[in-house]
């Protein structure tokens, strides 16, 4: 959030802020940070640095991005460069491969608590992120079982997204409906960002129900 706030007034300042954070603990950052650094560098008039971040992400780390994010205006200075085009082509192919293999994942394997909390991630997140975000709410209570539903649509390397359409929410609705007959005393569903939309659509347009919705 600080990076985005700084970028509103100064791309160079935002770039330096994020770069400092990355250099202080590089292992804590992944594909999205490299992408932000590339965009900030491009928008700050540093095309070589922008290209270097994309090279590191795509060529060195074997990550990939959704095709449309690599057409961002901040990356426009790179659009005619052969290396950028080659990197984008490689990323696009990896994305297509990921889409062809991907499917929705529901972590539930069986009932082992009285109550269930179903976590729904937001865009640029995944099921593991959702579980980690909501785990502190439940604490170490043995009466609650935490599960997550992950979208079938890749957003980037290791992350997924929901579409605001008439189909994407179906995976969430199906997970909710499957849980209704498992004998839980209470079912609570928590969503973040786009996950909130998926939960609301599930309740509005299907027979999926829960005892409480928590929307962030």
Model-predicted segments: where are they?
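Structural register within alpha-helical repeat arrays
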Residues: 1-2, 37
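A domain-start/cap signature at the N-terminus of enzymes
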Residues: 59, 63-116, 197
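Serine-hydrolase catalytic machinery in alpha/beta-hydrolase-like enzymes
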Residues: 115-182
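Primarily recognizes the serine-hydrolase "nucleophile elbow" in alpha/beta-hydrolase
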Residues: 185-216
């Amino acid at each position: 959030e600080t990076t985005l706030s700084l970028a509103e007034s100064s791309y160079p300042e935002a770039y330096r802020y994020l770069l400092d954070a990355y250099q202080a603990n590089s292992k804590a950052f992944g594909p999205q940070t490299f992408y932000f650094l590339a965009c900030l560098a491009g928008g700050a008039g540093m095309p070589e640095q922008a290209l270097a971040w994309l090279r590191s992400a795509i060529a060195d780390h074997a990550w990939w991005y959704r095709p449309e994010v690599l057409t961002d205006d901040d990356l426009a200075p790179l659009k005619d460069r052969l290396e950028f085009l080659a990197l984008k082509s490689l990323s696009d192919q990896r994305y297509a491969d990921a889409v062809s293999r991907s499917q929705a994942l529901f972590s539930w394997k069986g009932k082992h608590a009285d109550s269930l909390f179903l976590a729904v991630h937001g865009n640029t997140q995944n099921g593991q992120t959702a579980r980690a975000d909501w785990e502190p709410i439940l604490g170490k209570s043995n009466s609650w079982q935490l599960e997550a539903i992950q979208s079938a649509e890749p957003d980037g390397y290791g992350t997924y997204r929901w579409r605001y359409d008439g189909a994407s929410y179906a995976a969430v609705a199906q997970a909710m409906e499957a849980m209704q007959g498992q004998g839980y005393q209470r079912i609570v569903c928590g969503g973040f960002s786009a996950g909130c939309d998926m939960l609301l659509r599930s309740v509005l347009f299907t027979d999926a129900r829960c005892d409480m919705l928590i929307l962030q």
